[in-house]
């Protein structure tokens, strides 16, 4: 499985002909190295409807005939705009061609059309990826670790709108993933974080690896 960090909260997973993109905020993303026309996902997963996460999702979905997977409110809003969508909600699971999606809670807003914000645990060709979305720390992350053995947790660390790096270390302790990757930081001055210090803290305080990717970087997970 290839994991690519596009920037902010946007991450893409690829395996064979399957591509999943989370929160494709690309064209107006000041740290992204590509444009929305450079991605061609089969599936788009939206954690919430704020502009810095919804981003270019609707246009990408129309251009590529992608299936948008999100909460019922977001899926309904997308369908009204001509996008193919599958509605889910917190606590729900669903099998797809690539594997399984579980919708998890997130402590955040979503935008007027968005309902509740969420996260996802995606079993993508046998690798379990937890994208927390925008969220504060919450103790029920421990339940997520009881339900799923996570290979990599993608966690926000920028503070202000989400948990910061210190809380993300605690989240890692709750989730017990094999690896963790920080996102949603240093996009703007309002959400600063020291990713090298975060990596050091993860190494010292958890049993997880930490992968710090710059926007445009990718890695293989075997």
UniProtKB/Swiss-Prot annotation:
Disulfide topology: none
InterPro entries, per database record: Metallo-B-lactamas, RibonucZ/Hydroxyglut_hydro, UPF0173, UPF0173_UPF0282_UlaG_hydrolase
Annotated keywords: Hydrolase
Any one GO molecular function term: hydrolase activity
Superkingdom of the source species: Bacteria
Pfam families, A to Z: Lactamase_B_2
Stored SMART domains: Lactamase_B
PANTHER family: UPF0173 METAL-DEPENDENT HYDROLASE MJ1163, UPF0173 METAL-DEPENDENT HYDROLASE MJ1163-RELATED
Family: Belongs to the UPF0173 family.
Protein name per its UniProtKB record: UPF0173 metal-dependent hydrolase Nther_2337
Organism: Natranaerobius thermophilus (strain ATCC BAA-1301 / DSM 18059 / JW/NM-WN-LF)
Taxonomy of the source species: Bacteria, Bacillati, Bacillota, Clostridia, Natranaerobiales
């Amino acid at each position: 499985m290839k994991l690519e960090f596009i920037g902010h909260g946007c991450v893409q997973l690829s395996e064979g002909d399957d591509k999943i993109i989370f929160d494709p905020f690309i064209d107006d993303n000041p740290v992204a190295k590509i444009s929305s026309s450079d991605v061609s996902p089969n599936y788009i997963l939206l954690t919430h409807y704020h502009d810095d996460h919804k981003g270019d999702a609707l246009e990408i979905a129309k251009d590529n005939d992608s299936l948008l997977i999100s909460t019922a409110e977001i899926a309904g809003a997308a369908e009204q705009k001509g996008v193919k969508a599958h509605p889910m909600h917190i606590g729900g699971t669903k099998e797809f061609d690539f594997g399984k999606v579980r919708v998890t809670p997130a402590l955040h807003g979503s935008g007027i059309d968005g309902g509740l914000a969420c996260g996802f645990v995606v079993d993508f060709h046998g690798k379990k990826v937890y994208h927390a979305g925008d969220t504060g720390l919450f103790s029920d992350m421990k339940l997520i670790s009881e339900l799923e053995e996570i290979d990599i947790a993608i966690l926000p660390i920028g503070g202000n709108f989400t948990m910061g790096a210190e809380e993300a270390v605690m989240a890692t302790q709750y989730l017990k993933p094999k690896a963790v990757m920080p996102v949603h930081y240093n996009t703007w001055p309002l959400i600063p974080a020291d990713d090298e210090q975060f990596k050091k803290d993860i190494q010292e305080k958890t049993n997880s690896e930490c992968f710090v990717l710059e926007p445009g970087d990718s890695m293989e997970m075997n």
